[in-house]
Amino acid sequence: MEKSSSCESLGAQLPAARLPSEDSLSSASTSHSENSVHTKSASAISSDSISTSADNFSPDLRVLREANKLAEMEEPALLPGENIKDMAKDVTYICPFTGAVRGTLTVTSYRLYFKSMERDPPFVLDASLGVISRVEKIGGASSRGENSYGLETVCKDIRNLRFAHKPEGRTRRSIFENLMKYAFPVSNGLPLFAFEYKEVFPENGWKLYDPLLEYRRQGIPNESWRITKINERYELCDTYPALLVVPANIPDEELKRVASFRSRGRIPVLSWIHPESQATVTRCSQPMVGVSGKRSKEDEKYLQAIMDSNAQSHKIFIFDARPSVNAVANKAKGGGYESEDAYQNAELVFLDIHNIHVMRESLRKLKEIVYPTIEETHWLSNLESTHWLEHIKLILAGALRIADKVESGKTSVVVHCSDGWDRTAQLTSLAMLMLDGYYRTIRGFEVLVEKEWLSFGHRFQLRVGHGDKNHADADRSPVFLQFIDCVWQMTRQFPTAFEFNEYFLITILDHLYSCLFGTFLCNSEQQRGKENLPKKTVSLWSYINSQLEDFTNPLYGSYSNHVLYPVASMRHLELWVGYYIRWNPRMKPQEPIHSRYKELLAKRAELQRKVEELQREISNRSTSSSERASSPAQCVTPVQTVV
């Protein structure tokens, strides 16, 4: 069943949550915004003013001063719009790597924050509430044994966080209730934190992607393709963007008849066009052929028009992402696939990529073997049993086949799965990443995500479950995570071809869940417009593009005209340790890669300056020599001057 209303309560159900009061800190988290202004809370100011006279007045006030300072040290530095909701002292975090540690647990409107002053340096755990999948109580009031009474939070980013409370302290109930309230605001009729976040960045990331500019970059419109506004009010297809690129000889009225034959009205539309051959990548959903094998003359004519727009080939490939058995099964639900008898000069290829439920189960198995401990003796067999890398291989291999048909075969391709918003997005975006060097730049990749994932209706709200306590929802699936994993695999095989680094990819995934930014909220462009996200929330790209040096690959060399052909075999794929096992301190490199990147970037900039200086010097010498050679008077002048 479709869940079209799952975005309606993200930000407009209640009056906006209050901004930080004088009782809360209003400074920026160093993990998100190092340049924000830090301000003291009223409590900190008042404690300082009390302590001014305390030194000469009362031992009790000195104790109060020290207690206030300790409390201030234990509190998190808050983001603009963030405020503290609950705090519990004398809580024990059961760290699976370094053992139990006692400290203060704080719940804010944005994060779960634990800090212990018992270790040097202090132990800090900082997790956004958006990353929490579920919260469970452990033990009862009569539970015996140390640390047997508390809470466990299961997270979407592989982690499980376990906290022990003292039964007599009665803090567990309060923390549990506040976590359930603020980690799942949609389920409680509250706005997501993205609607409260008030940070201002130099660049507005919401303006990064302009579809007209992106299509113009590709040479669209041209004699074969046009931009239509038929979906301006999202009436043709409510999960497609307002602007669509379609064959120039197909009128808008005919598009409506094609839409009636495609699942959810998702007609074939252009994603990318080859600058030389004019071969295209188009995307859509499955045809509604059903068990009876229905046909649509308009749909057949439409695909013929796509093929005819490419004079280099008299054939078109239809890549169906599904296993063939699944595609056949979809006929019973009214769906199905294109018959080669009905579609002249079309070849149908099944790519055997499994559905969202298989992928969700695969990630669950992966989590079991990587967190909290890794069983060394059976590591390879355990990893194989998850089938995670096998799924990554099939996605990469499918995208590679698409890119190869377009580049080497100079043939246009049509890509779809069932509804065209999960596996289709994986395949088109990865193929475009292989074909077009622009998408391998930082801003180009952001445009790719905005275009192929966000504007074309990948259901982020349902797949991630932003602010929703229903952790067992069958619509949840790591589709976008798999795409980013595939991108990382490509960066490993082509380390100089991408302008962005690993930290860039991890940052995107962290904020896929965090609900700090509005970028990944809602299920479609239409829903984001209704929620007015560009006005009410901050874009993730605003944050990233304000500090590009953090996300830049120092090894990058511009290969804009190169097509990448990654090897999609199990021998060349590896588990992304930097993401899936990053919480294990034993897996961290001794030298932080992030700081090493910055050093290399600084060194590269220094060397580039020297190269430019030498080039200018050579140019000046060359100019001077040519002038002396061409002018006899100038040749004599130095001699006369010497005399």
Curated annotation (Swiss-Prot):
Catalytic activities: a 1,2-diacyl-sn-glycero-3-phospho-(1D-myo-inositol-3,5-bisphosphate) + H2O = a 1,2-diacyl-sn-glycero-3-phospho-(1D-myo-inositol-5-phosphate) + phosphate; a 1,2-diacyl-sn-glycero-3-phospho-(1D-myo-inositol-3-phosphate) + H2O = a 1,2-diacyl-sn-glycero-3-phospho-(1D-myo-inositol) + phosphate; 1,2-dioctanoyl-sn-glycero-3-phospho-(1-D-myo-inositol-3-phosphate) + H2O = 1,2-dioctanoyl-sn-glycero-3-phospho-(1D-myo-inositol) + phosphate; 1,2-dioctanoyl-sn-glycero-3-phospho-(1D-myo-inositol-3,5-bisphosphate) + H2O = 1,2-dioctanoyl-sn-glycero-3-phospho-(1D-myo-inositol-5-phosphate) + phosphate
GRAM domain boundaries: 68-139
Chain segments carrying region Disordered: 1-52, 614-643
CDD domains per UniProt: PTP-MTMR2
Membrane-topology annotation of the record: Peripheral membrane protein
EC number annotated for this UniProt entry: 3.1.3.95
Residue positions where Phosphoserine is found in the record: 6, 9, 58
Top-rank EC class of the record's enzyme: hydrolase
Binding-site positions, a 1,2-diacyl-sn-glycero-3-phospho-(1D-myo-inositol-3-phosphate): 330, 355-356, 418-423, 463
Bias type Polar residues, positions: 23-40, 632-643
Parts forming coiled coils: 593-627
Protein name: Phosphatidylinositol-3,5-bisphosphate 3-phosphatase MTMR2
Organism of this sequence: Mus musculus (Mouse)
